[in-house]
A protein has these predicted regions:
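PEST-like low-complexity, intrinsically disordered acidic/proline/serine-rich tracts
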Residues: 2, 21-305
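Bacterial N-terminal signal peptides
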Residues: 7-18
Length: 305
């Protein structure tokens, strides 16, 4: 079971607290900090295996693209540039928390953002102060499930629904395409993954609207907030038989002065039909062990200073 890299996180976090505290006038840097002298990873040279420990063939670069089928998103998909492309540990792909990509916060949105204490990005805090709800095994929720650790997904279609099964958190979403509207203007029971309805805009573009999202979730891994008024639009455009592009737009006038694209034509590649999705789960027992070995000692250490 791939449990959100709990063991590597323990090692990294433990090493972090053995380092001297940052000077107060030193701006925070993303953790773990990249090695400026490291060569870029060529993911095409990595051995790629699925959840069944079987090799996944790398498609030939000169392979001619077959046309996209009509009204069909079904299949198993992974980030076309390699699994690292979907990690997004510094936040949404189009707006990483790097001090350069500034979101259009409302005053309330900025206040809510500052109240969130992530372990990554320009507002990162020591692990003792982190308040990421996913770190206590709350459901990751939507849209964060597509904006953090977007790995393999499997899309199934029925007459009335499109179902998306995610490797991350081993969960799924139902998207109704039978013409229904949202339950009401004021959805009284928000959901971790919201209420989703979709329709075909043309032969190869499926547009999804999602509302009724639980405001306790974060939009991404660096604590971008949302309100109960959040609407998310996804555009799944099947460019060819093997490539699917995903654009995800955040619409929340309570927190942001205008809509913004968290993903823009993010490419996913079709995998073989016998590709097995790995298991990635937040385990409460492993999280408890992490707290025992890392979080509690860090909190105790911070109180001594």
């Amino acid at each position: 079971m791939l449990s959100r890299f709990v063991v590597p996180t323990i090692v990294l976090a433990a090493s972090m607290f053995s380092l001297p505290a940052r000077a107060q006038n030193t701006p925070p840097t993303p953790f773990p900090a990249p090695d400026p002298g490291a060569l870029p990873v060529d993911q095409s040279q990595e051995k790629h295996i699925d959840g069944w420990y079987r090799d996944v063939p790398v498609p030939p670069k000169d392979q001619k693209a077959a046309p996209a089928p009509r009204h069909d998103l079904s299949g198993i998909w992974e980030p076309a540039a390699g699994w690292r492309d979907g990690v997004q540990f510094l936040g949404a792909k189009e707006y990483p928390s790097d001090g350069k990509h500034i979101l259009p916060f409302t005053p309330l949105g900025e206040k809510a953002f500052k109240a969130n204490k992530p372990g990554f990005g320009t507002t990162e805090v020591p692990i003792a102060l982190n308040n990421d709800p996913f770190d206590i095994c709350d459901p990751i929720g939507f849209p964060r499930i597509e904006l953090f650790n977007l790995r393999a997904i499997q899309i199934l279609q029925t007459e009335k629904q499109v179902l998306i099964f995610y490797q991350n958190d081993r969960t799924f979403r139902s998207i109704w395409k039978d013409g229904r509207q949202f339950p009401s203007q004021d959805i009284s029971e928000p959901r971790w993954y919201g209420y989703s309805i979709g329709k075909w805009e043309d032969d190869t573009t499926f547009v999804v609207q999602t509302a009724g999202l639980d405001a306790r979730t974060w939009i991404d891994n660096v604590g971008r907030p949302h309100s109960g008024d959040l609407r998310v639009e996804e555009r799944f455009h099947r460019v060819s038989h093997d490539i699917l592009e995903l654009t995800l737009t955040i619409i929340d006038p309570t927190m942001y002065t205008k809509p913004w694209n968290a993903l823009s034509k993010f490419p996913l590649r079709l995998q073989p039909a016998d590709f097995d999705l790995r298991e990635m789960l937040c385990s409460p027992s492993e999280q408890a062990e992490f707290d025992k070995q890392v979080s509690r000692p860090a909190i105790a250490d911070s109180k001594k200073k």
